[in-house]
Amino acid sequence: ALAEKAASLMAAILGWTEQQFRELGKGKESADLALHLVTVLQGASLLTHTFNQPDLLLRETARLREWVNAL
């Protein structure tokens, strides 16, 4: 039950993120772009908490911001 709820939440986050890329005009690649963005954020969050190093998340979000702006 918990896994299903977590999957539902992540699906909603991915869906919303994909929609944002669609609104930016990214069309067919929107789902892949959304998956990349969410995957990087989740991984950075995990490592930030694991190593108790908030700067990891700050660095990755800065890189992602540059990446999105370059799209």
Functional labels for PLM-detected ranges:
Residues 2, 26-33, 53-57:
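Residue-level recognition of alpha-helical structural elements
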Residues 1-4, 21, 25, 48:
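Short coil/turn segments at secondary-structure junctions
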Residues 32-39, 59, 63:
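Amphipathic alpha-helical interaction segments
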Residues 10-34, 68-71:
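Hydrophobic alpha-helical bundle segments that form small-molecule/ligand-binding pockets
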Residues 1, 38-56, 69-71:
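Amphipathic C-terminal alpha-helical segment
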Residues 6-13, 56-64:
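Extended, well-ordered alpha-helical scaffold segments
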Residues 16, 40-43, 63-66:
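Alpha-helical scaffold segments in carbohydrate-active enzymes
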